[in-house]
Amino acid sequence: LIRTLMKWTPVALDKPTDYEARAEIMFACTFGCNGILALGMGQSGWPMHGIEHALSAYYDITHGQGLAIIMPHWMRHILCEKTMPRFVKFGVNVLGISPKLPDKEIAEKAISGVSNFFKSLGMPMTLREVGIDDSRLAEMAHHVAVNEGLDNPKNFYPLSEKDILEILKAAL
């Protein structure tokens, strides 16, 4: 899905009337939003959506803006030996990074690649760019911890309230 979005979003932005680009984006979004990708897997492996829900609930920003800001910071925060294989797979299969590179380099290039893609679309990359300061970060982190279930041990990488706050602070 991400590869599809990375291919067709620049086309749609360049030519908004391109039916094929719009159709591909809508088809990818349908799968991204309907939960089918998580069937049989428990919680999503991409919990930055839960973190972003607080951003757009507390502030007037779109889900896409919030994800563009949160995703690279979440990826950096959870990068470790346990998560490395998933980021390597993502980097190789989605971003076309050479599998011959060391795993850590692939993972870091994957994170940079995501960030650079969002930047290329003109998306905001920090909370400050969308008018969010640190005044409510702890409140939002608590809200996410209580309501989103991101600390579930069945999650790919469980996140505590402290983790969520650190991700939000890094995104400033």
Please identify what each model-predicted range represents:
Residues 94-172:
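C-terminal charged capping/lid subdomain of soluble metabolic enzymes
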Residues 1-113:
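Active-site segments that bind and position negatively charged phosphate/pyrophosphate groups
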